[in-house]
Amino acid sequence: MRTGECMKGLELSREELVECENAIEESIVRVVELSNQNGAVIALSGGIDSSLVATLASRVVDAYGLILPDPASNEPQDAQDAVDLAKSLGISYEIIEIGDIVAAIYASRPKLGPKECTLAYANVKPRVRMIMNYFASNLDGRIVLGTGNKTELLMGYFTKYGDGGVDMLPIGDLYKTRVRQMARHMGVPENIISKPPSAGLWKGQTDEREMGIAYETLDKVLYGSFDLGLSYGEVEKDTGIDEATFTKIMERVKNNEHKSATPPIVDIDAVLTIRHTK
């Protein structure tokens, strides 16, 4: 393997970007039509992923932006960026603060402190947003478009039945590196593209700080391992990643596979068939 193959493979040409653009837009239209719905709901966070999905969707279906900030954890500028994007795209949008809803859920378990269940508390916000997304979806006859990318899906960096609760993942096969390329190709504002990615789970939270690795390096590791089928030694030559970190990434991917899997169903027919053949 030549040094740099991982990064080179992640870079999309202009022709490839156009192909991705067309494929995603056609798929959005197809899913909306097959679902017999009128359009799509996108939860706009002011971040790059939701901005890209909204930009793509706005070109082909009736898109509606739902901006759901929690003042306790979201920066006001993010909501403003979401509003500015919706206006620039010419799509309808609504701002609904979810702080009181989140606080009411927290209050239902007053004996639990934040240190005891930090993850449980953090996951409440994406799950509240999922409820709001589907409330709007049911009211208006729209599908819910998710904003997760391939890096997040592989790493399990999303909330099960939260931001993972959607009808379609338009950019779910694009690594974060490619999301940035697509965003520039589609004209997403540079101030959105350049801001540190954050799930907005708490004040000052960023994806890269929480995962302990930069997206650029992480994408090289994931792309090299899963798309190119390279060994650790080959990936290490290209990225310089140490074996302990590589192993940690692979373990996280494995441990979070359940998040993207269909809930298991006990195969009763098989059990009864076996019983009757004895």
Predicted regions and their residues:
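Catalytic subdomain that performs nucleotidyl-dependent activation
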Residues: 87, 118-129, 143-220
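ATP-dependent adenylation/nucleotidyltransferase module used to activate substrates
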Residues: 2-158, 235
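A non-catalytic, amphipathic alpha-helix used as a structural packing/dimerization or gating element
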Residues: 19-27, 174-185, 227, 248
